[in-house]
């Protein structure tokens, strides 16, 4: 997969560093919330993601990852081609639907 001339592999090392940072500095965060966010790192804006993650997790706790996903998806949809925003919105909607159904069952 290529995105704007960059291989998706460029996102793997930052993902590794981020996962180590999360494990050592923050309380446990559900993996099902982190993986979609990692996908956003690989596809788009690493620095924006890290900044929002640090601020939102410290201030709002683990539920802020939902907010973070929406903010990054919105930012990506504003700066992408005409097809990508639809895909991003659909992926974000699917993630939120899954989280809602999981909370209902718990």
Swiss-Prot record:
Record GO cellular component, one term: mitochondrion
Localization (cell): Mitochondrion
Keywords attached to this entry: Mitochondrion
Superkingdom of source: Eukaryota
Misc note: A stretch of 270 kb of the mitochondrial genome is duplicated within the centromere of chromosome 2 resulting in the duplication of the gene. The expression of this duplicated gene (At2g07701) is not demonstrated.
Protein name: Uncharacterized mitochondrial protein AtMg00430/AtMg01150
Organism expressing this protein natively: Arabidopsis thaliana (Mouse-ear cress)
């Amino acid at each position: 997969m290529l995105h704007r001339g960059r291989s998706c592999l460029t996102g793997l090392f930052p993902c590794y560093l981020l996962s180590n940072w999360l494990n050592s500095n923050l309380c446990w965060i559900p993996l099902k919330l982190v993986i979609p966010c990692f996908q956003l790192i690989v596809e788009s804006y690493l620095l924006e993601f890290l900044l929002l993650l640090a601020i939102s997790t410290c201030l709002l706790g683990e539920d802020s990852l939902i907010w973070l996903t929406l903010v990054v998806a919105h930012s990506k949809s504003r700066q992408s081609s005409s097809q990508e925003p639809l895909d991003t919105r659909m992926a974000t909607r699917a993630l939120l639907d899954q989280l809602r159904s999981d909370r209902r069952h718990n």
